[in-house]
Amino acid sequence: MNTGLYELPLVFFTVLAQSAVGAWLVFTFVLLNEKNTKSRTYIHKVMFVILALLGIGFIASIMHLGLPIRAFNSLNRVGSSMMSNEIAAGAIFFTLAGFYWLIAILGKMPVSLGNVWRIVTALIGILFMYVMNQVYHITSIPTWNNALTSWSFYLTVVLGGLTLSYALLIPNKQREYQLQHLPSLFAIGVSLVAIVAIYQGFNLHNIHSAIQNAADLVPNYAIMTVTRLCLLSIVAFLLFRVKNIGLLGISVLLTLVAEGIGRVLFYGLHMTYGMTIGG
């Protein structure tokens, strides 16, 4: 379990980056159909929050690497290393999103160009998420090299992205877009998280090395998972029931904490064939 806590910078990076990409996807769709100029101005202003969270995530990843220069050195292996591909894809996504926001907030972004720019950025974001997931599919780590890792990572994109975008977009008084389906999509996502977590809990006893059982790495798996699901259930209730900005902000925080708990468990399950790290 100690491994999960030691990897807190990666917990922050993965959860925040995934949530930011998920929110960008929602913003991209909303802006494609939003014609009201004042509404679009509002959307572009709150888009900064997405970039800020993404920036915090990248700062956390640099903390994990130790020195910023190591991130640049990692780019030398783009194409041959998934970690290098992850850094490159993330940097491109951040750059495209940042320049789009800057040009749009200055009022210099044509609508047609903006639509294309956001879609291209969204596609790069999806690639970023795919590569981030692939980084952890390591043959020698049986607890990570399975479909549950993909489900876990992509569901964070869904949950974090939906909550963040809903909290940012619903206060817009000039909006012409509708967001009534987002709470339902979030509830479906929570249900899938519960299914994945329960399945993983039962499956842990079947994964072991010569000296370690995977279940022993996360002795608090049950209580942490229950806590995570309770937090996500509270968020689902808030999304369905309230429009208060403060409570919606709390829903974002609770979602990030809940997914952070899930990610701590994920890193705590680091186990290689023949040896273990954690416990």
From Swiss-Prot:
The lineage of its organism: Bacteria, Pseudomonadati, Pseudomonadota, Gammaproteobacteria, Pasteurellales. The keyword Lipoprotein does not apply. It is found in: Cell inner membrane. This is Anaerobic dimethyl sulfoxide reductase chain C. Disulfide bonds: none annotated. Terminal reductase during anaerobic growth on various sulfoxide and N-oxide compounds. DmsC anchors the DmsAB dimer to the membrane and stabilizes it. Residues 31-45, 108-118, 172-181, 241-244 are cytoplasmic. Keywords: Cell inner membrane, Cell membrane, Membrane, Oxidoreductase, Transmembrane, Transmembrane helix. It holds the Pfam family DmsC. Heterotrimeric enzyme composed of a catalytic heterodimer (DmsAB) and a membrane anchor protein (DmsC).
